Amino acid sequence: CAWLMAFACALAWASDDYKIKVEVVQKGNAFHTQASFYLPLTLCQSYRYLTDYDAATNIAGVVASTTTRIDARTARVERLIQERILFFPIKMRMVMEFTELPNLGTDFVQISGEAKYYKGAWRLESEGNGTVFKYRTESEPDSFLPKAVIEYFIKNRLNSSFETIAKMGAERVKQPC
């Protein structure tokens, strides 16, 4: 029983250790999202993780992710996402273009997909013995989804998605740069 308690406490501590923060503000039909988390990775390791676009298939709902290099600092990523939100089955396809800023982050914009628009950035900031990942987006979902469904997804899935992203990144602590 003591081992079970210790394990549960270790899991709770590990989750808090990422210092995950997520904030979503709706302005009209657009959603502005800001999120951040901390990982014990160097800037170089963090940048390599950030630009491993196809690792997203380990996040719940991301069924496929295919990356095509446009040039040395630009990547086009096509993703297929399937979710069940409340009782609604949702299938979305998007094509994103990422502009890479070595060891600083990425800028991205949806060039085709289900949202009216989706754009944002990841930024990396060295802090102590690790890196803070900062995410910000502006998006306007297509109106084919009921507003309540969109709000449910944003409020209930974003935290768990960022927690998964942080856990996957933390597993790369021993990978060379």
PLM feature spans:
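Glycine-rich portal/gate segments that line the openings of hydrophobic small-molecule binding cavities
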Residues: 27-30, 38, 57, 61, ...
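Extracytoplasmic/secreted envelope proteins and their assembly/folding machinery
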Residues: 43, 47-53, 121, 155, ...
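Hydrophobic ligand-binding cavity/cleft-lining segments
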Residues: 11-72
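N-terminal signal peptide c-region/cleavage motif recognized by signal peptidases
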Residues: 7-9
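Short, surface-exposed charged micro-motifs
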Residues: 23, 66-67, 97, 119-123
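Bacterial N-terminal signal peptides that target proteins for export
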Residues: 1-4
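One face of beta-strands
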Residues: 18, 31-35, 92-94, 118-120, ...
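Beta-strand/loop substructures that line and gate deep hydrophobic ligand-binding cavities in soluble
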Residues: 110-156, 160
